[in-house]
Curated annotation (Swiss-Prot):
4'-phosphopantetheine is transferred from CoA to a specific serine of apo-ACP by AcpS. This modification is essential for activity because fatty acids are bound in thioester linkage to the sulfhydryl of the prosthetic group. It comes from Borreliella burgdorferi (strain ATCC 35210 / DSM 4680 / CIP 102532 / B31). GO terms for molecular function: acyl binding; acyl carrier activity. GO terms for cellular component: cytosol; membrane. This is Acyl carrier protein. The keyword Zinc-finger does not apply. The gene is acpP. The modification O-(pantetheine 4'-phosphoryl)serine is found at S39.
């Protein structure tokens, strides 16, 4: 799975969960500042991402996610 495929899947999940248009979401989009996600939104997003990519996201790693690109890079590393 390459970065574009991962980003597309992540963007789709974020778009649906946060009710944002996909073209508003970039790898530089910040969850809180740009996408207006609150802590519950982020928790739900993490759950959906874990389900979609069949992988557990450790809490210490999740706390480091500021942008959509951070999530894409994390998943890319895990999926090799």
């Amino acid at each position: 799975m390459d970065n574009d495929e991962i980003f597309s899947k992540v963007r789709s999940i974020i778009s649906e969960q946060l009710d944002k248009k996909e073209d508003e979401i970039t790898t530089d989009s910040r969850f809180v500042e740009d996408l207006n996600a609150d802590s519950l939104d982020i928790y739900e997003l993490l759950y959906l991402l874990e389900e979609a990519f069949d992988d557990k996201i450790p809490e210490n790693e999740a706390n480091e996610f500021e942008t959509v690109g951070d999530v894409v890079n994390f998943i890319k590393k895990r999926k090799g």
